[in-house]
Amino acid sequence: MSLLVLEVSPAGATLADADIVFGALSANGITCDDLVVAVGDTATCSVVCWCANQWCGRTECALLPTTFDAMLTVATTMKPLVASSAHALPAIAFRPEPGLVVCDLDLVREADPEDLKLGYAVLVGTMLSSSKSRWNQFTETVPEILAGEEVALVNAVQWSQTARKDVLMATNPSARHALDFGKTGERTLRVCLGDAASQVPAYQLLSEGMRFEARLAHDACDFDIDYVFEVDDCLEDFGIEELAFDLEPAAYIEEFRRQQFVRSNRSMLPLPAALGAIRLTSVEDEVLERHAHAYLASRKELL
């Protein structure tokens, strides 16, 4: 057994990080009959699992995620890699198939509450893609999750895995994009805030993306306004407050549209029409502009 200590940026691994992993696999004579084990956050587990999948046709990989968001996601999705700092689009990804994922919930109970909030935001978005009954179960157990109760945490992880697997295995191609809900808004805000975005926690950017896109969904696909407010309430229950900032609507709208085409040629967003029904939906310019103006005005008032 050989140990490799890999320092990966929480923002995401690069191909340079992958090259280090490949070098270690080669130096240690790892073959497809061996086992690669990754211990770390989402970015670390993602790059190691990606490398193991390429090595010798495919080498089995086991993951031991150490953060709550990683426990919820690494079995089904990986954090995309970037080619280099000069090509910073995080677009190198595949569906991970680790042979084993082991979650130590003591790490969740002992963690700083601030370090759990990205996991909470991911959990809210994931549960929106599940059924109405599962969403209701989830919202009722938020206090127990926050208290670190074992049964509630086990249920949260299990519900997340089931919901994410169902999305990836959906027969409707449109439904397979459900896990991207909120991410267009997240990327838009990150770009528009510029250097200031580095001071904003990742969970807050993702949460703002979900808040904004939930409002778009109300107009674009008749998403019940009560559920829009439930999303807001759930995020606030997890201690994720609204973010205060001042942006020009025209610049925000232009960047939002640009982000839609970064990963796809379709001008459509994964939006919830109902609980458990997040589908690709076309958003009219008038709807986007109206909601963007209202959203940005509300955030400016927080300053």
Q: What is the predicted function of each stretch?
A:
Residues 1, 121-123, 225-303:
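C-terminal charged capping/lid subdomain of soluble metabolic enzymes
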Residues 1-35:
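ATP/NTP phosphate-donor binding region
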Residues 7-9, 39-41, 169, 181-182:
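Glycine-rich beta-strand-to-loop/alpha-helix junction loops that act as flexible
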Residues 28-51, 55-66:
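A short, small-residue-rich loop immediately preceding and capping a beta-strand
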Residues 33, 96-98, 109, 229, ...:
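Nucleotide-activated sugar donor-binding and catalytic core shared by glycosyltransferases
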Residues 50-144:
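A glycine/threonine-rich phosphate-anchoring loop and its flanking beta-alpha core
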Residues 65, 104, 183, 210, ...:
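Residue-level signal for inorganic ion chemistry
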Residues 141-250:
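Active-site segments that bind and position negatively charged phosphate/pyrophosphate groups
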